[in-house]
């Protein structure tokens, strides 16, 4: 769960007040994904800091990160609307990356390697949610968004997982986007493009299903969405 936290552990560099940051977090946080995807049977890796402090699913090299051009690379310097929110010095960047970004990725890599040692394979479920209306900086501006979205990797996502996902959500009565409106799924760099025993699939949930948007108040369908998410996780695990 890379984007479920609202914790900002270090305020250095921010040029906006707490009220502004709270408003931005309301928009950008993947609300309650740590609960919606919770499983006592699996290893849960949760970033304990907000994405507007450090986004663990961005590349650290801005030349490789498409969102860096909008000031929303690994360390957000602009809001979704484009306002300047933080001034990041080289020293601050190094501190945040070393103390937070790489610490998170080290935990992630250790968890994946433990699964490989125990079972010879590992399945990563990259857990997210998204607003029903595109964000200002979203690359996909199509306003007609599906209920759920899976993201895939051409090397690390087996076709059978894609097919299973499509049939599951169709049979359950939900719409599903494949690599739409968001694409890709995370893999530790040490295994990326090298080890097919490390499998990955991203699942994104449309927040309109479980929140009373634009608030972060849980809707009456929250438990329904949590249950269907749990069923999906059990299904793809059983297919391994």
Residue ranges and their predicted role:
Residues 1-124, 129-240:
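N-terminal catalytic or cofactor-binding beta/alpha core of small enzyme domains
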């Amino acid at each position: 769960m890379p984007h479920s936290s609202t914790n900002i552990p270090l305020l250095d560099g921010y040029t906006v007040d707490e009220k502004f940051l709270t408003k931005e977090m309301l928009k950008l946080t993947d609300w309650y994904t740590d609960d919606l995807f919770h499983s006592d049977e699996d290893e849960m890796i949760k970033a304990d800091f907000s994405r507007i402090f450090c986004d663990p699913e961005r590349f650290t090299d801005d030349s490789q990160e498409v969102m860096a051009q909008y000031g929303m690379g690994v360390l957000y310097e602009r809001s979704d609307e484009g306002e300047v929110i933080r001034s990041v010095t080289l020293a601050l960047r190094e501190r945040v990356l070393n103390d937070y970004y790489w610490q998170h990725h080290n935990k992630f890599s250790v968890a994946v390697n433990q699964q490989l040692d125990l079972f010879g394979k590992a399945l990563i479920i990259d857990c997210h949610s998204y607003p029903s209306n595109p964000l200002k900086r979203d690359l996909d501006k199509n306003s007609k968004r599906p209920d759920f979205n899976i993201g895939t990797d051409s090397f690390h996502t087996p076709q059978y997982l894609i097919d299973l996902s499509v049939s599951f959500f169709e049979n359950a009565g939900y719409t599903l986007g494949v690599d739409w409106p968001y694409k890709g799924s995370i893999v530790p760099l040490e295994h990326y493009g090298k080890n097919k025993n490390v499998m990955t699939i991203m699942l994104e949930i449309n927040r309109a299903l479980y929140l009373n948007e634009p608030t972060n108040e849980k809707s009456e369908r929250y438990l329904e969405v949590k249950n269907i998410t749990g069923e999906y996780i059990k299904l793809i695990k059983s297919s391994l």
